[in-house]
Amino acid sequence: RKLLLIKTGHADRTTNKRLGYWRKAPRLDPAIARLLSELGHRVSFVPEHLPWQGTYARNLQRLGVEVIHAPSVQNAQSFILENGSDYDLFFLSRATTGGRILPALKATYPEKPIVFDTVDLHFLRLLRAAELTGDTKDFQEAETVKRTELAAIHQASATMLVSEHERAYLTDEIGPFPHVLLPLILAPHTDRTGYEERLDIAFVGGYRHPPNIDAVRYLVQDIWPQLRALKLGARLHIIGSHMPADFQDYAAEDIHVVGFVQDLDTYLSSIRVSVAPLRYGAGVKGKVGNSLRLGTPVVATPVAAEGMSLTDGEHLLVANSPSQFAQALYRLYTDRPLWERLSSAGQSRVETLY
């Protein structure tokens, strides 16, 4: 069968720069494309933004994927609607892209199956952001995206979700619907650097994603001063691409504003504790899964740990206030038996699940 993958982003956008490390761990196009190709399907990929600049598109082509790009194609939606008859199935991603295109695609090719990949529930993430800010405009945006996202789910032949949590949430909202669960796709990593060989604390994120910006501000302004007061002596590493300019103002003797890291596996394998203080979001968190994969224990908010089938105190530590975070970070950083237990159990858990 010939499949058309339609996704937000650019034909040249590397996953390194997308989220600060070498792949968008949960649902990277190459991972999905590779699985589809191994099943014998011919895959074409249409990014929302068409300019070609190299690395990412070439990586897809090495997997046998046809990449549609400029200058041969100037408008992604026009190409899709005009050439849809050449394909047996459409795979659309994200409410902001796939959700917008899906109604026209369904009207033009009503007989063709469409799979809608939420990536995360966008409206849920925006609703949680609105609850944090209390801004009427944020609530209105969340409601607009909710209508688009739920309409796409209703019209799709099947919806792809990342977690049982979001499946249950949607079922409560709209009742039963055709769906499939595809969680994180993580490469195995059996090696684990020991406690003594590691130092410091790190946050990893891509800063085109607003929850990560908010998390860093919360970490630096509210959590880190309390950890300083405990005289832990660790340094905070803020990692990831597309940082706001004012992040440089956070640089201090005990705060290293790193930016983009090419080889995150090596970097995180030298870090003693990973922190995920997300105050809002949805889906499953690649930063949590990737850290645990490397044997780097995590302190996370309930939102950051949500939907990942991880247990507080067994696979990671969960904290929900600045004081809880400071205490959990101090405890995990200094308590070697606890660190070793969570490092081993967390790595084993994600190896089993993802």
Residue ranges and their predicted role:
Residues 1-58:
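N-terminal subdomain of nucleotide-sugar transferases
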Residues 287-291, 297-301, 317:
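Short hydrophobic beta-strand element within catalytic cores of glycosyltransferases
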Residues 316-323, 331-336:
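Conserved acidic donor-binding segment of nucleotide-sugar-dependent glycosyltransferases
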Residues 334-354:
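A charged, aromatic-enriched C-terminal amphipathic alpha-helix characteristic of glycosyltransferases
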Residues 17-35, 44-45, 154-160, 164, ...:
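Conserved catalytic-core segment of nucleotide-activated headgroup transferases in glycan assembly
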Residues 111-112, 116-144, 168, 206:
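Acceptor-binding helix/loop patch of EC 2.4 sugar-transfer enzymes
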Residues 86-89, 157, 266-283, 294-297:
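Acidic donor-binding loop of glycosyltransferase active sites
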Residues 302-313, 317-318:
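Short acidic/histidine- and often glycine-rich active-site loop of Leloir-type glycosyltransferases
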